[in-house]
């Protein structure tokens, strides 16, 4: 009997990395490899790493070490794969190191260290590929890389410049996901609103209609699938205004995950972020005028090098005016290779500006500013995050935010219909 190699797989990092893991696993399954959920039963382990924040690098190195200790045969891929010298220095036992989206060389390494009898098992793989998300939703990655040059970020160095997929290619994948029973699509990329810029918005045919490879046509086409479509990682560019009417019409979910990071013009300038605070506020108000049910989420960085008390107050004032429905607030963390590391590392306290070396370790100024920002949002985020009409708001803990912060999310409309049915039954019964 031919032994089929068993592969253990660890996926770290963001949703974009998870999609990479899905593609790798789909390829392995198509070749007949078994996937197992423990180190002990695996002939080899693949670790798909994250290499963005220093904390993510530490976690990736720790997991690689754990896999080596528990199994011994380890292949490393993903964002940290671009720092092969660092991995080899820490873990010389690693068998192979490949970077993000380097699927061909990774699979070749798998063949080398866990060879399999040549065969074609494509028929055993579902048309939509192997998915690591729950069955009801799936990530839909529309591009790789990024053209922005934010000073706190090294994504372009890790994943390269923007590389958009053609719109017909994306729609074919979306259709396969729908046919597989997926109800919700989470559209992701590094910069969703820049989709198609690099391929000059080239046209594609789907469902006998011509569409351009831009975010507006893509949202329109996805809206015709009769699925929930949610847009993530959107920059507040002017053309995003054209997407909001689709939300008002019920074509896609009235939800925008908008990358803001800060509001102070000085901080944004140092971050090299393409944003103008007043225009952003005007745009948010315009979106709400067009689609009153829209839910807007964002993330912010506090304690960025050079941030002053005035800058932080500007951010608090912006938060009060914007009244965002959902926020993630993060303390600035140095990223190896980021240009922001060269800035004067100044952050404020209520009494003035101090250098980080003057901060008491038990309560850093970054934590103070983050705590203050979160306190403001505690009063402003307990609102129904409407993604469709007739939903019941329910309080849940959101692991993406501070543990003390609770947000309202929505329970599917079937529940409210059930409640109404029960109430009507009781009224009729006891009338």
Swiss-Prot record:
A single MF term (Gene Ontology):
metal ion binding
Question: Where can this protein be found?
Answer: Cytoplasm
Against SUPFAM superfamilies, the record matches this protein to: Radical SAM enzymes
Binding residues annotated for [4Fe-4S] cluster 2, in chain numbering: 146, 150, 153
Q: What sections of the protein cross the membrane? A: none
Major enzyme class: transferase
Among Gene3D superfamilies, the record links this protein to: Methylthiotransferase, N-terminal domain, tm_1862 like domain
Q: Where does [4Fe-4S] cluster 1 bind?
A: 14, 50, 79
How, per the record, is the cofactor bound?
Binds 2 [4Fe-4S] clusters. One cluster is coordinated with 3 cysteines and an exchangeable S-adenosyl-L-methionine.
What is one term from the GO cellular component aspect held by the record? cytosol
Q: Which reaction does it catalyse?
A: L-aspartate(89)-[ribosomal protein uS12]-hydrogen + (sulfur carrier)-SH + AH2 + 2 S-adenosyl-L-methionine = 3-methylsulfanyl-L-aspartate(89)-[ribosomal protein uS12]-hydrogen + (sulfur carrier)-H + 5'-deoxyadenosine + L-methionine + A + S-adenosyl-L-homocysteine + 2 H(+)
In terms of superkingdom, the source organism counts as Bacteria
An example GO BP is:
tRNA modification
> What job does this protein perform?
Catalyzes the methylthiolation of an aspartic acid residue of ribosomal protein uS12.
Of which family is this protein a member? Answer: Belongs to the methylthiotransferase family. RimO subfamily.
What is the protein name given in its UniProt record?
Ribosomal protein uS12 methylthiotransferase RimO
């Amino acid at each position: 009997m031919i032994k089929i190699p068993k592969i253990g797989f660890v996926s770290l990092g963001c949703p974009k990395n998870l999609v990479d893991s899905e593609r790798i696993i789909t390829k392995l399954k198509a070749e007949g490899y078994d996937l197992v959920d423990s180190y002990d039963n695996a002939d080899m382990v693949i670790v798909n790493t994250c290499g963005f924040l220093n904390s993510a690098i530490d976690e990736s190195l720790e997991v690689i070490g754990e896999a080596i200790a528990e199994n011994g045969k380890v292949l490393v891929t993903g964002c940290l794969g671009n720092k092969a010298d660092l991995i080899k220095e820490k873990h010389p036992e690693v068998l192979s190191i490949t970077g993000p989206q380097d699927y061909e060389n990774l699979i070749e390494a798998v063949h080398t260290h866990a060879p399999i009898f040549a065969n074609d098992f494509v028929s055993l793989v579902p048309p939509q590929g192997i998915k690591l998300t729950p069955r009801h939703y799936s990530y839909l990655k529309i591009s790789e890389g990024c053209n922005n040059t934010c000073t706190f970020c090294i994504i372009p160095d890790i994943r390269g410049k923007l590389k958009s997929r053609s719109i017909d290619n994306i729609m074919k994948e979306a259709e396969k996901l729908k046919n597989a029973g997926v109800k919700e699509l989470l559209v992701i990329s590094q910069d969703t609103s820049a989709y198609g810029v690099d391929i000059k918005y080239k046209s594609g045919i789907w469902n006998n209609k011509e569409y351009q490879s831009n975010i507006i046509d893509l949202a329109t086409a996805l809206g015709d699938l009769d699925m929930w479509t949610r847009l993530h990682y959107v920059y507040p560019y002017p053309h995003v205004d054209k997407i909001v009417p689709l939300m008002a019409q019920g074509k896609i979910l009235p939800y925008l995950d908008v990358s803001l990071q800060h509001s102070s013009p000085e901080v944004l300038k140092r971050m090299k972020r393409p944003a103008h605070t007043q225009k952003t506020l005007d745009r948010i108000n315009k979106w709400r005028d067009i689609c009153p049910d829209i839910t807007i989420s964002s993330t912010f960085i506090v304690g960025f090098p050079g941030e002053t008390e005035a800058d932080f107050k500007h951010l608090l004032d912006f938060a009060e005016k914007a009244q965002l429905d959902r926020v993630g607030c993060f303390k600035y963390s140095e990223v190896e290779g980021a240009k922001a590391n060269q800035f004067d590392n100044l952050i404020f306290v209520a009494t003035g500006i101090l250098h980080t070396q003057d901060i008491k370790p038990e309560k850093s100024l970054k934590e103070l500013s983050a705590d203050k920002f979160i306190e403001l949002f505690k009063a402003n985020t307990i609102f129904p995050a409407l993604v469709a009409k007739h939903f019941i708001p329910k309080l849940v803990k959101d692991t993406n935010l501070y543990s003390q912060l609770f947000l309202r999310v929505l329970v599917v409309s079937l529940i409210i219909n059930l409640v109404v049915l029960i109430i009507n039954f009781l009224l009729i019964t006891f009338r």
